[in-house]
Amino acid sequence: CSEKTEGCIREIDCPLADAQLVMLHTLYFKGAWTDKFDPAQTRTETFRGNLREVAVPMMHDRQRAGYAATESFTAVSLPYGNEAYSMLLVLPAAGTDMAQAGRALADGAWKELTSRLYGAQVDLKLPKFELAYDTSLIEMLQEMGIHDAFSGEADFSGLTPDPLYFNVFKQQSVLRVDERGTEAASVTWAGLDTSLPEGGEEPVA
């Protein structure tokens, strides 16, 4: 994992020694801003989150970027390098909680924002931050309708003749944003065994 993610994720936080079969997928991205932030302009300020306020190193710059605004959201698109890729930053209107914002973006607000982007001079204040995320994907996959893979109905005969089931399916991600750009990595792994995940269905005889 460390080699594939350039050291962002050194090891996965899950024992797989007893798994009969392991599936592993890695992603890595590193992009430099087209217009970098000046570290001398970074200073500690208050960031107002959904539940609390925290002091963070806040980056400042005035640059031309993609910009869009609706009654519910404001968005800025910051390009990397030759502008083949960009980061879209979305700020919900005051008083909007994250769950409500997430539902709105999934229901079409994201598409509306991206269709409204236009070039503008923008005064930017962006936190310098690092995030780490580790979660099981089993519940999410089951909510999407994937059930057999975690039960006695699983059929992986194309991979192995053994009657195996997914007993772990996890993802670990890291995101870093600073004055130079963005670095991100993700590792998704699944372990198959003859045992079932907690709460899984019993094998069908």
Residues of each region from the PLM?
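Secretory/exported precursors with cleavable N-terminal leaders
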Residues: 1-205
